[in-house]
Amino acid sequence: MSKKGKKYIAAFSKVDKSKFYSIEDAISLLKEIKFVKFDETIDISINLNLKKNHTVRDTIVLPNQFMKPKRILVFAKGDRADEARAFGATYIGDDDLINKIKSGWDEFDIVVATPDMMKDVGRLGPILGKRGLMPNPKTQTVTNNLKDAINSLKKGRTEFRANKNGVISFSFGKSSMDNAKIKENYDEFIKEVVKKRPSDLKGAFIDSIYISSTMGPSIKIDFVWR
């Protein structure tokens, strides 16, 4: 058995799989069982009770940021392009960027577009859609208010959504962060998810919550949000 495998098993053995941990205890335990040197990301997995017609999708700005700055690409023309440039977008353009992306360029993390550009940007659907980067009004990435869009993205606004199995996977901290700040991010995220409860849903909305670190085992969370 590899040294890495032994360390994982040792960490795994410290987690009681039959127990529901408070978020405070779970965060402390993740740090206690950490066995790698790099700064691990802390992730959450929420299993929701959803019907086929239900959609859970939104964006959030966590109170305590931890991710590296995103490279923001904005499709805009004229005054809108000047506005995007003034507020710090990384790349701004129209047909030139569309052609560049078609040629295989992909050095960007978020895509924003003004409404008048969407007809042209739509040609990039197969490319941007595969990366989950297609601009969408629901995620506030199709807008004429570039100031607010860019500023919120620079602050870390991130999309979350439930997959076809009703599971939301999301990163909300780093192991190097103060426990209280990790918990604050957790609380804010859960609060935003609960707001997306479908109005016609009967019974519990959240079935289960687990958190884990990049290399560590998952820990089941005790929760009261329904």
UniProtKB/Swiss-Prot annotation:
Domain of life: Bacteria
Example of a GO MF term: rRNA binding
Keywords: Repressor, Ribonucleoprotein, Ribosomal protein, RNA-binding, rRNA-binding, Translation regulation, tRNA-binding
Cross-referenced Gene3D superfamilies: 3.30.190.20, 3.40.50.790
NCBIfam families listed in its UniProt record: rplA_bact
HAMAP family on file: Ribosomal_uL1_B (MF_01318_B)
Function: Binds directly to 23S rRNA. The L1 stalk is quite mobile in the ribosome, and is involved in E site tRNA release.
Protein name per its UniProtKB record: Large ribosomal subunit protein uL1
Lineage: Bacteria, Pseudomonadati, Spirochaetota, Spirochaetia, Spirochaetales
Gene name as annotated: rplA
